[in-house]
Amino acid sequence: MSERNQRKVYQGRVVSDKMDKTITVVVETYKKDPIYGKRVKYSKKFKAHDENNQAKIGDIVKIMETRPLSATKRFRLVEVVEEAVII
């Protein structure tokens, strides 16, 4: 039996938790400009499955690629790395 492919794991910040069992995570990373070689920061939003609704806005979370769970969800919550500070 063959092994499963290596799945992508990203760490990002929760920007929305308004949907039931779904969070929106923004992942910030750097790309190198092809002409000038300067590192440019860019971000991308992913929707992730949160089975127990445990992540809140501002939390730092780890998400992992999985099978398509809906039209837009392709990731699931692995763990909450750091909880947001509520003032």
UniProtKB/Swiss-Prot annotation:
Oligomer and partners: Part of the 30S ribosomal subunit.
UniProtKB keywords: Ribonucleoprotein, Ribosomal protein, RNA-binding, rRNA-binding
Protein name: Small ribosomal subunit protein uS17
Gene3D superfamilies attached to this UniProt entry: Nucleic acid-binding proteins (2.40.50.140)
Source organism superkingdom: Bacteria
Functional summary from the UniProt entry: One of the primary rRNA binding proteins, it binds specifically to the 5'-end of 16S ribosomal RNA.
Database matches in InterPro entries: NA-bd_OB-fold, Ribosomal_uS17, Ribosomal_uS17_bact/chlr, Ribosomal_uS17_CS
Record keyword Cell membrane present: no
Any one GO molecular function term: structural constituent of ribosome
Family the UniProt entry places it in: Belongs to the universal ribosomal protein uS17 family.
One Gene Ontology biological process: translation
Gene Ontology annotations for the cellular component aspect, listed alphabetically: cytosolic small ribosomal subunit
Gene source species: Bacillus velezensis (strain DSM 23117 / BGSC 10A6 / LMG 26770 / FZB42)
